[in-house]
Amino acid sequence: KHSLPDLPYDYGA
């Protein structure tokens, strides 16, 4: 996802 990440390592996912 490219919106608001739930996890700190989920930014580019």
UniProtKB/Swiss-Prot annotation:
Keyword Glycoprotein in annotation: no
Localization terms from the record: Mitochondrion matrix
Cofactor(s) in the UniProt record: Mn(2+)
Mod. after translation: Nitrated under oxidative stress. Nitration coupled with oxidation inhibits the catalytic activity. Deacetylated by SIRT3 upon exposure to ionizing radiations or after long fasting.
Cofactor binding note: Binds 1 Mn(2+) ion per subunit.
Reactions performed catalytically: 2 superoxide + 2 H(+) = H2O2 + O2
Residues passing through the membrane, by range: none
Presence of the UniProt keyword Metal-binding in the record: yes
Cellular component aspect of the GO annotation: mitochondrial matrix
Disulfide bonds: none
The protein's Enzyme Commission number: 1.15.1.1
MF annotations from Gene Ontology: manganese ion binding; superoxide dismutase activity
The entry's keywords: Manganese, Metal-binding, Mitochondrion, Nitration, Oxidoreductase, Ubl conjugation
Assembly mode: Homotetramer.
UniProt record similarity statement: Belongs to the iron/manganese superoxide dismutase family.
Role played: Destroys superoxide anion radicals which are normally produced within the cells and which are toxic to biological systems.
Full protein name: Superoxide dismutase [Mn], mitochondrial
